Amino acid sequence: MIKKLFGVVAVAILAGCGSLSIGGNGDSDVLSGVGRIPGYDFGTAITLPEGFEIELPEIKGGLIGPKVSGNRLLMIGDSILASTSSRYGNEMCDALVPLGWQVAIEAEASRFAEFGVRVLDQRLNAEAGWDAAVVFLGTNYEGNKDSYAKQIRKIVQKLAPRPVLLVTTSMFRNTQREVNAAILVVAGESENVSLLDWEIISKAKGVLNNDGVHLSPKGRSVFAVAVARALDIAPYRDGACLESKFRDDSAAAKDVMPEPVDTVNEPTASSTP
């Protein structure tokens, strides 16, 4: 078994020369193009796409990496998360695999919260080895806040006691306030849940497309960096981009999704020494 990471580790996630500031206790290092991820005794270089200056908010509930004993990560979402998967630009795996995470992205366009339950019914029951999860569902919202909260709560309960990172949505319409409020409530109910406030990050100019919902090309890299910061280094260094089972983006509106790659990236292992 690969030994747990220790000491000082330097990992370059993304190329670029943006400026990153990390919120929290106010004493994090801030350099041009470099951010400090707390959580282990190591240094990690995080770079944003050129032209971005973003302060990442504190991760409520704490970083995921220090809470887990394994590195298998299940990510569940809609078109926004899907756009960062290996069938498109692969931004998410490019960011997380060097940190030691074995990442499965189960995300499809136009999916509502109940999609998360369906994913877990298939992947959680068949594979008990997941160590943590990221859930980003709520952009597609039917307008019933109680029903939405029930679905998110059910997802969290199915995943318990695994650490879960819930992600708020961008505020592209007034009803998203109900979505994000429900996410905050559910996050506050469970000790195993942490919160990434994408609502704040997505306000930065250039992160979203003109529709105010989906990610711009550089925004996909920003999103991957934000998730990487919330996760932190995994306990093991054998990162990999795992095969996805849910890949149907046919419900997406025209020009919503990026251009797909001709050949989906094969599952890869990290070359982190």
Regions found by a protein language model. Give the residues of each.
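A short helix->loop->beta-strand "cap" motif at the edges of active sites that frequently abuts
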Residues: 160-164
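Conserved SGNH/GDSL esterase-like catalytic core that processes O-acyl groups on lipids
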Residues: 66-151, 171-181
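Extracellular glycan-modifying ectodomains
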Residues: 18-26, 117-124, 128, 140-158, ...
